[in-house]
Amino acid sequence: MYGESLVKLMLALDVMDEKKAILIAKETSEYVDSIKIGYPLVLATGLNIIDKIKESTNKEVICDFKVADIPSTNEKIAELTLNHADGIICQGFVGSDSVSAILNVARAKNKKVIVVTEMSHPGATEYLQNVAEDMAKMADRLKVDGIVAPSTRPERLKEIKSIAKDAFVISPGVGAQGGNLSDVLNVLNENDYVIIGRAIYENENPKNAAKKYKIQM
Ligand code: O7E
């Protein structure tokens, strides 16, 4: 039914209205493997939106709070978030003690931790890019479940993925940010996810847009 590479599709559901979020999540769920919810939707509607999206789609929901604090605060954020979500995204630049605090909470709840390395926007080349390989090494050493690396720079995606070799990759940048899907699919495999937001939820027919991407994967 779908393409050869079988890379997974993660919908970035950054709308700010509960009804719209649930409608788009339901409409696209046939073509989506996982749903990423972040500050826009949670701040607009509350953490319970995670349970509502899970109930209405039966999909895994990953919470994207890019947590970046000292260990004890990270632990509190992870505890509250992982009472709802299947996984949590945190920043790697805060260091291994802060990431480990989240990992400890997640392991106790059998949930996933995904660490950001290099981000996809142009500004990521100013600071983050310089330490992205080191963060990928830390992710490998700590045995986190997944890492985030950019679809806007496929050569960097490849390099970072080769360092954190046991982690799955979730990669944003295809669609609105200009990343090229086929370049990215050359790097990713069946454990990895392409993250797409606006190119699906801002389309006048989100279901068709999700289908269009999924059949290429
Ligand atoms: O550009 P879009 O609309 O397809 O959405 C991309 C999503 O990925 C959006 O939620 C944004 O916040 C997120 N993202 C990036 O775009 N770049 C990054 O480097 C990292 C993320 C991200 O989600 O980090 C955690 C996966």
Curated annotation (Swiss-Prot):
InterPro entries reported in the protein's UniProt record: Aldolase_TIM, OMPdecase, OMPdecase_arc, OMPdecase_AS, OMPdeCOase_dom, RibuloseP-bd_barrel
Q: Which residue ranges run through the membrane? A: none
Which cellular component appears as one GO term in the record?
cytosol
Where is substrate bound in this sequence?
14, 36, 64-73, 120, 172-182, 197-198
In this protein, the active site sits at K66 (proton donor)
Q: Which GO terms describe its biological process?
A: 'de novo' pyrimidine nucleobase biosynthetic process; 'de novo' UMP biosynthetic process
Which reaction equations make up its catalytic activity? orotidine 5'-phosphate + H(+) = UMP + CO2
* GO terms, molecular function: orotidine-5'-phosphate decarboxylase activity
Q: Pathway of this protein?
A: Pyrimidine metabolism; UMP biosynthesis via de novo pathway; UMP from orotate: step 2/2
Listed EC numbers = 4.1.1.23
**Amino-acid biosynthesis in keyword set:** no
- What keyword terms does UniProt attach to this protein? Decarboxylase, Lyase, Pyrimidine biosynthesis
Task: Please state which protein family the record places this protein in.
Answer: Belongs to the OMP decarboxylase family. Type 1 subfamily.
Entry function: Catalyzes the decarboxylation of orotidine 5'-monophosphate (OMP) to uridine 5'-monophosphate (UMP).
Subunit structure of this chain's protein: Homodimer.
Annotated protein name in UniProt:
Orotidine 5'-phosphate decarboxylase
The gene is pyrF
